[in-house]
């Protein structure tokens, strides 16, 4: 195990049996939520931080679920003793969001009324629905107000949604490499993924459970996604124009190293993720827009009362920095004083999973300031 790891952790589950109302008007029950916690909740219950994961993440953000695990949780370098989210000081919560396939109820879960997986009978959900379910978990844990909600990419969308929908429930937010709505280009890449899965003959209109999995479609969808997670510079550094086979450029089935990378990661992804969950989640990403229900984007962002630290990366292709700059400017126009750090990086969108040192310094300083402010109230 790595040094300064939170060590062995157990994924916990809670099932809410009351009706859950989706933004679409659909109702579902029961709903199970998978979550993990790190650190200790203090007596005042004012040191709790909610970490929100990205598109294909899970509740397992730090530590190890088993002594045999080869890798720790997906943000282990950021969560633990002395790290950005210091477990000696804060109580960290990470839950698998609604519709995913890592323990929280989603399309692959069993519909109790039929005894079969929901498939496409599962309601279309939104980022706001994810946040509403997270709030049920926070209420269940007896936490009145979160010290902070933080996350990268789609996790940052959830942090923003928390601040807009439940402004009274968090003292601060740290949205990283994210936006209040995605660009048409991002929707276009998601469309490729959607088309690839739905055109796979094994998808069978979402009714593939217990049958042949739509592996090719999901692998291609992941390949398209991977392109947006990197940058031109990171592609050059990692692969250049190197050829991966010995047949030479005139071998019809020869391929470049970058092709090999996309193919390998695409198919590896199919071993751990559900195709229907992927379709539902990218749908939630596409339709996410903070302005919905508030008249305008400016009005929605004006609802944010939480102290805010925004982090972006100069080479982010999927969520360009100008999207955060727009939010920051709107907040300033509403008399707020958000902090914004634009980190120089060649890693592209994936920088939030790789640029640990630069993120850690500004996050630790920001959280310490918020913690002291709350403690002195």
Swiss-Prot record:
Chief place of localization: cytoplasm
Residues reported in the UniProt entry to bind substrate: 222, 350
Gene Ontology CC terms, in alphabetical order: cytoplasm
Catalytic-site annotation from UniProt: 153, 316, 349
Name of the top EC class for this enzyme: transferase
Pathway stated in the Swiss-Prot or TrEMBL entry: Amino-acid biosynthesis; L-methionine biosynthesis via de novo pathway; O-acetyl-L-homoserine from L-homoserine: step 1/1
UniProt-recorded Gene Ontology molecular function terms: homoserine O-acetyltransferase activity
Keywords carried by this UniProt record: Acyltransferase, Amino-acid biosynthesis, Cytoplasm, Methionine biosynthesis, Transferase
InterPro entries reported for this sequence: AB_hydrolase_1 (IPR000073), AB_hydrolase_fold (IPR029058), HAT_MetX-like (IPR008220)
Cell compartment(s), UniProt: Cytoplasm
GO annotation (BP), single: homoserine metabolic process
Domain AB hydrolase-1 intervals: 47-355
Reaction(s) catalysed by this chain's protein: L-homoserine + acetyl-CoA = O-acetyl-L-homoserine + CoA
Enzyme Commission code: 2.3.1.31
NCBIfam families per the UniProt record, alphabetical: homoserO_Ac_trn, PRK00175.1
Family label: Belongs to the AB hydrolase superfamily. MetX family.
Oligomeric form and interacting partners: Homodimer.
Function in brief: Transfers an acetyl group from acetyl-CoA to L-homoserine, forming acetyl-L-homoserine.
Protein name: Homoserine O-acetyltransferase
């Amino acid at each position: 195990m790595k040094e300064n790891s939170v060590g062995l952790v157990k994924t916990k589950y809670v099932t809410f049996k009351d009706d859950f109302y989706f933004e679409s008007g659909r109702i579902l029950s029961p709903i199970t939520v998978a979550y993990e916690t790190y650190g200790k909740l203090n007596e005042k219950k004012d040191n709790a931080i909610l970490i929100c994961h990205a598109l294909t993440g899970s509740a397992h953000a730090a530590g190890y679920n088993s002594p045999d695990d080869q890798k720790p949780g997906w943000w282990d370098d950021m969560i633990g003793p002395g790290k950005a989210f210091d477990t000696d000081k804060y109580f960290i919560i990470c839950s698998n969001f609604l519709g995913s396939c890592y323990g929280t109820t989603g399309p692959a879960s069993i519909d109790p009324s039929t005894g079969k997986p929901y498939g496409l009978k599962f309601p279309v959900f939104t980022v706001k629905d994810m946040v509403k379910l997270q709030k049920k978990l926070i209420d269940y844990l007896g936490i009145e107000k979160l010290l902070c909600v933080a996350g990268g990419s789609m996790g940052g969308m959830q942090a923003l949604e928390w601040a807009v929908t439940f402004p009274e429930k968090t003292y601060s937010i740290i949205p990283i490499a994210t936006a209040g709505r995605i660009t048409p280009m991002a929707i276009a890449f998601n469309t490729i993924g959607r088309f690839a899965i739905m055109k796979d003959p094994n998808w069978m209109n979402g009714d593939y459970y217990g049958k042949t999995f739509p592996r090719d479609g999901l692998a291609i969808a992941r390949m398209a996604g991977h392109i947006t997670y990197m940058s031109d510079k990171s592609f050059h550094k990692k692969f250049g124009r190197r050829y991966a086979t010995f047949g030479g450029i005139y071998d019809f089935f020869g391929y470049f190293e970058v092709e090999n990378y996309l193919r390998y990661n695409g198919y590896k992804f199919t071993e751990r993720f559900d195709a229907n969950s992927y379709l539902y989640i990218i749908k939630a990403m596409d339709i996410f827009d903070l302005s919905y229900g508030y008249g305008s984007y400016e009005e929605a962002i004006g609802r944010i009362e939480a102290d805010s630290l925004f982090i972006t990366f100069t080479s982010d292709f999927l969520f360009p920095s100008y999207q955060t700059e727009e939010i920051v400017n709107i907040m300033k126009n509403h008399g707020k004083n958000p902090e914004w750090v634009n980190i120089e990086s060649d890693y592209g969108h994936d920088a939030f999973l790789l640029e640990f040192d630069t993120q850690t310094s500004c996050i630790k300083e920001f959280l310490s300031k918020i913690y002291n402010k709350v403690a002195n109230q």
